[in-house]
């Protein structure tokens, strides 16, 4: 199905107001994009963090009369008659199919392969995780996920219990189970992530060994031999008191979702409870690991 997009340029302070205006004019979705392609890495909980110079992009059905949309927007106090905008007809593509065509099997460490569920595995004798990420984060393509998978591959997980804090697609918990863990526990704030993890666990034949919880439902007394959390630096710092009590004495901790420039502050939040290893970097991201005191 083809679409029409309307793009407005504004300041970050006005972006939310213009987003509302586009929705009222009939947009089916809104995207914020930095005019200068500068990334925003870490919005705080409940906050939409925006750039100083922001493009607000509304997506409209192809049958929409854009003259009517422009007329509605001209009445907005931030815009007015003759406001600057750009309207484009988007090419009709099967975006899901295009994404699937570009997702290939990937190897992490010595044993582990992450394979799209619609492709053949490259090595039948390897540890193969068949993945369909659905709407949740975690395909292995991001450096932070890659760092966590390589770390898990390097461990002897035989008979161990693993907690995946912020499980997303379930990729880390499922990889741990395929690498020999006896049990994994996935925790995520997003019900879609819980469902994606459940589906992927069933696809890999490990659903009987994977427990999944929203934070409000997780057991009070949870302990694991290995805890991995691939979220963001801010939540890792804020949740340090909670995450630090999850590993058993002598248990292992792996943290990622952290920019290299944020490593020191995250290390400080965990240094009292863990003997930390040297930070491992990949591109601009890093992984922090350690052993519980």
Curated annotation (Swiss-Prot):
Binding site for S-adenosyl-L-methionine: 145, 166, 188, 230
Keyword Transferase: yes
Catalytic activity: L-lysyl-[protein] + 3 S-adenosyl-L-methionine = N(6),N(6),N(6)-trimethyl-L-lysyl-[protein] + 3 S-adenosyl-L-homocysteine + 3 H(+); an N-terminal L-alpha-aminoacyl-[protein] + 3 S-adenosyl-L-methionine = an N-terminal trimethyl-L-alpha-aminoacyl-[protein] + 3 S-adenosyl-L-homocysteine + 3 H(+)
GO biological process assignments: methylation
Gene3D superfamilies on file: Vaccinia Virus protein VP39
Main location: cytoplasm
Keywords for the protein's UniProt record, in alphabetical order: Cytoplasm, Methyltransferase, S-adenosyl-L-methionine, Transferase
Gene Ontology molecular function, alphabetical: N-terminal protein N-methyltransferase activity; protein-lysine N-methyltransferase activity
Phenotype when the gene is knocked out: Mutant lacks several methyl groups in protein L11. Null mutant is perfectly viable.
Disulfide bonds listed in the record: none
EC numbers for this chain: 2.1.1.-
Localization per Swiss-Prot or TrEMBL: Cytoplasm
GO cellular component: cytosol
Superkingdom to which the source organism belongs: Bacteria
InterPro entries found in the cross-reference section: Ribosomal_L11_MeTrfase_PrmA (IPR050078), Ribosomal_PrmA_MeTrfase (IPR004498), SAM-dependent_MTases_sf (IPR029063)
UniProt-listed CDD domains: AdoMet_MTases (cd02440)
Stated role: Methylates ribosomal protein L11.
Similarity section: Belongs to the methyltransferase superfamily. PrmA family.
Protein name stated in the entry: Ribosomal protein L11 methyltransferase
Organism encoding this protein: Escherichia coli (strain K12)
Gene: prmA
């Amino acid at each position: 199905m083809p679409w029409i997009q309307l793009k407005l340029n504004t300041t970050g302070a006005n972006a939310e107001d213009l987003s509302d205006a586009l929705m009222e004019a009939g947009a089916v979705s809104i995207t914020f994009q930095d005019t200068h392609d500068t990334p925003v890495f870490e919005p705080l909980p409940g906050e939409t963090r925006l750039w100083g110079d922001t493009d607000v992009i509304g997506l409209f059905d192809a049958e929409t009369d854009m003259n009517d949309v422009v007329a509605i927007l001209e009445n907005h106090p931030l815009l007015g008659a003759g406001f600057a905008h750009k309207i484009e007809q988007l090419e009709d593509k099967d975006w899901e199919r295009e994404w699937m065509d570009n997702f290939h099997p990937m190897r992490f460490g010595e044993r582990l392969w992450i394979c799209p569920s619609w492709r053949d595995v490259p090595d039948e004798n390897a540890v193969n995780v068949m993945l369909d990420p659905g709407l949740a984060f975690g395909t292995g393509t991001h450096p932070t996920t890659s760092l966590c998978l390589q770390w898990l591959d390097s461990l002897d997980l035989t008979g161990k219990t693993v907690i995946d804090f912020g499980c997303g697609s379930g990729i880390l918990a499922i990889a741990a189970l395929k690498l020999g863990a006896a049990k994994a526990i996935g925790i995520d704030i997003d019900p879609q992530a819980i469902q994606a993890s459940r589906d992927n666990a069933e696809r890999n034949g490990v659903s009987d060994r994977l427990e999944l919880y929203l934070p409000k439902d997780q057991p009070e007394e949870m302990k694991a031999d290995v805890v991995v959390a691939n979220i963001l630096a801010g939540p890792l710092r804020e949740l340090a008191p909670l995450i630090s009590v999850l590993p058993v004495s002598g248990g292992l901790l792996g943290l990622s979702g952290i920019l290299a420039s944020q490593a020191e502050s995250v290390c400080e939040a965990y240094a009292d409870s863990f003997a930390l290893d040297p930070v491992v970097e990949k591109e601009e991201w890093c992984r922090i690991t350690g052993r519980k005191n």
